[in-house]
Amino acid sequence: ANATCSYFADCAAKIQSWTCKSGYEKSGNSYIAAVKIGSYIYSDGSIGNEIIANKTIIAIIVDTSSRLAMSLEIETVKDGTEADTFCKNFTTQGTSSGSWSCPTMNDLQLIYNNKSILNNSLHNAGRPRLNGEDNIDPVYGNNWRYWSSEMTNYGNRRAMLLGKGNITSFNNSWPGYTIPVRKY
């Protein structure tokens, strides 16, 4: 041991550094499970890597460096204008209208890059997976169109076909899917 202490405050001046075991990180004077892609955000603001009974999951972490999370609610068959309204007005237990938005193209790219991990978390939470893994769209198969918040110079809305990661744009009146996102 590098110090003999009767309580933590007595040790603070004696211990120069300490580390956590793998899968955990420091949080003040203790440790918590490390936040990772696919971790769950609960309505009380806590984050966990496992499903916790009697807690409500409201989001899944998409990217830790940009602190991006996506809703568990994937809204279907909205045109581009409806998608914007849906995302701006979206609420969950513990969040309010205006705290969510439609994803940018960069956000959709992060979702696509981490789709396998996110699908595992969605599936474990009892939610449909991204891109029709559980429900094949009759028109798009498993290459669903997900709207972004971005428009082109020609008035079309930018989107990503999540099956293959194709970036494209479509008439704003066409149907598609949207995923509200927020920073955590």
Where are these regions (language model features)?
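Small-residue (G/S/T/A) turn/hinge positions that recur once per unit in extracellular repeat modules
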Residues: 1-3
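Tandem-repeat/low-complexity and Cys-motif detector
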Residues: 5-10
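Extracellular cysteine-rich, disulfide-stabilized repeat modules
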Residues: 13-22, 31-33
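Extracellular adhesion/carbohydrate-recognition regions
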Residues: 34-100, 144-146, 155-159, 175-181
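An exposed tryptophan-centered "aromatic clamp" motif
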Residues: 84-99, 105-169, 181-183
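Extracellular carbohydrate recognition
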Residues: 170-174
